[in-house]
Amino acid sequence: MVNAPIKLLIAASGTGGHLFPAIALAEKLPDYEIEWLGVPNRLETQLVPKQYPLNTIAVEGFQQGLGLSSLVILGKLIGSILKVRRLLKQGNFQGVVTTGGYIAGPAVIAARSLGLPVIFHESNALPGKVTRFFGPWCSVVALGFDVAAKYLPRATNVCVGTPVRSQFLNLSNNSQLDLAIPGGVPVIVVFGGSQGAVAVNQLVRQAAPAWFEAGAYVVHLTGDRDPDVDSLKHPQYIELPFYDNMAALLQRASLAISRSGAGSLTELAVCGTPAILIPYPFAAEDHQSYNAEVFTKAGAALSFKQSALTAELLQNQVLNLLQSPPELAKMGENAKAIAVPDSADKLAVLVREVVER
């Protein structure tokens, strides 16, 4: 008699930072029957249904204070917990994995109420409020950065790194860039994560002319909400909302200018790309600054608060680095040293240990 496959529910929603690691994990569990838990009208509705059945619940975060809107949210939360509990019970799931965010709460509560194991992956150096609250409820919290452990004293945790998309696993096999960039020229790649970064885009456009004069090409991934798109034209300036083959692009880059979301940093590290980091100032609890600190302490990046960064300062920092190839090379080596390229494998092993014990 053939054993039925283990059923696993993955609760991951919102941005690429939550979704890409979860998808990378799922691909390492081909013998599992996996379903997804997400939120309507979020990125997962575009990425997940091609590979896994997607179940959705309505859930959102609480604002400060306890007003009518918070009571409405509380009502939705209770309804979501009951819906997830019913899904887990009727589907005979044997475990839950979550990558955090608002969706983690209903998933963890529902799973633990049924006695199911929960693996929580936290990619940030400063764990989010949801992780800090629900971490002790979980079987184990898998960490992207080991410095996060000090914020989770009551949770069982292990550092496995943050899984990257499959294109980053075989870097030598990446196809050539289909961009009009000659060989041997410095390339600056600018990106703001899966949502773009309007403020960074504005600084870059003001600073870029001096970089062109220095012979550099700029590949600027603006996101799809940039109001100033097409405002800068230059033969050495390539402007795109997104670019699919990020692994090849970051390998070609001499330098990246980026936000410091955990997913972006993980990809920079795997590719050994030196970076100038501009933490998103409105991130919850300023957690992107904690992520950036890991890289600056390791000598893999420079970091600047957005409020203190001018176009002139950014312009000069980039020019100084371009004029010092040995420094860029050392930063790239330091970034590589942070990377955990087999993170998805390590997380998959952890999931198997917890779910199958």
UniProtKB/Swiss-Prot annotation:
Look up keyword Transcription and say if it applies: no
Q: A Pfam family matched by this chain, by name? A: Glyco_tran_28_C
Q: Where in the cell is it found?
A: Cell inner membrane
Reaction equations catalysed? di-trans,octa-cis-undecaprenyl diphospho-N-acetyl-alpha-D-muramoyl-L-alanyl-D-glutamyl-meso-2,6-diaminopimeloyl-D-alanyl-D-alanine + UDP-N-acetyl-alpha-D-glucosamine = di-trans,octa-cis-undecaprenyl diphospho-[N-acetyl-alpha-D-glucosaminyl-(1->4)]-N-acetyl-alpha-D-muramoyl-L-alanyl-D-glutamyl-meso-2,6-diaminopimeloyl-D-alanyl-D-alanine + UDP + H(+)
Q: Which controlled-vocabulary keywords does the entry list?
A: Cell cycle, Cell division, Cell inner membrane, Cell membrane, Cell shape, Cell wall biogenesis/degradation, Glycosyltransferase, Membrane, Peptidoglycan synthesis, Transferase
* GO cellular component annotations of the record: plasma membrane
State if Acetylation is listed as a keyword.
no
Q: According to the lineage, what is the superkingdom?
A: Bacteria
Q: Which residues bind UDP-N-acetyl-alpha-D-glucosamine?
A: 15-17, 124, 165, 194, 288
Protein's UniProt name: UDP-N-acetylglucosamine--N-acetylmuramyl-(pentapeptide) pyrophosphoryl-undecaprenol N-acetylglucosamine transferase
Species source reads Trichormus variabilis (strain ATCC 29413 / PCC 7937)
Top-level taxonomy: Bacteria, Bacillati, Cyanobacteriota, Cyanophyceae, Nostocales
Q: Quick one: which gene encodes this?
A: murG
